[in-house]
Amino acid sequence: SELGAGTRGASMGVDALKIAAIDLKSDYFRKYDEVEISDENWLLLENVKFKYAKRIRGIMKIYERLSKSVGRIMKKQAAYPIVLSGDHSTAGGTIAGIKSAYPEERLGVIWIDAHADLHSPYTTPSGNMHGMPLAAALGEDNLEMKTNELDEKTVELWDKLKNSGGIVPKIEYRDLVYIGVRDTEE
């Protein structure tokens, strides 16, 4: 999916990796089972309904699908899935799935990105959800840095997104490690 990004093209990354593997004569994508999660990219053709949480309804659907799939794989197969996706708004669904498989365990996250991705609809300058997955996983609104006034529906949808998988928070700040961050989005 690329619903969370402000520019297009991220959802083509997985296919680009597969083509590169073929060119390199790698059997990587043949030797492991693949589960494809349907995206909601058709929503890119629709008008944005929530200025500070663009396409949040579609992202919620992806979170739910991804969370269920990751949780099921980890519980039933005792395997660790490798999730290849488009923009990183979907990382929240992966985190929710891992937490659902291990609800009593602390979950650590290593975040490799130029941005901290701790925005919420209350703080986002763009409304793009790819800047919010860690805030959602942390159950964080960041109200002390609030710059946006939200309508009731946006608040309701954001609260539902944070509650994906039924556990809030999914991670704690002390279990979060950043690599490559140059913008902490103060």
How would you label these PLM feature ranges?
Residues 1-186:
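Conserved alpha-helical scaffold segments that buttress catalytic/binding sites
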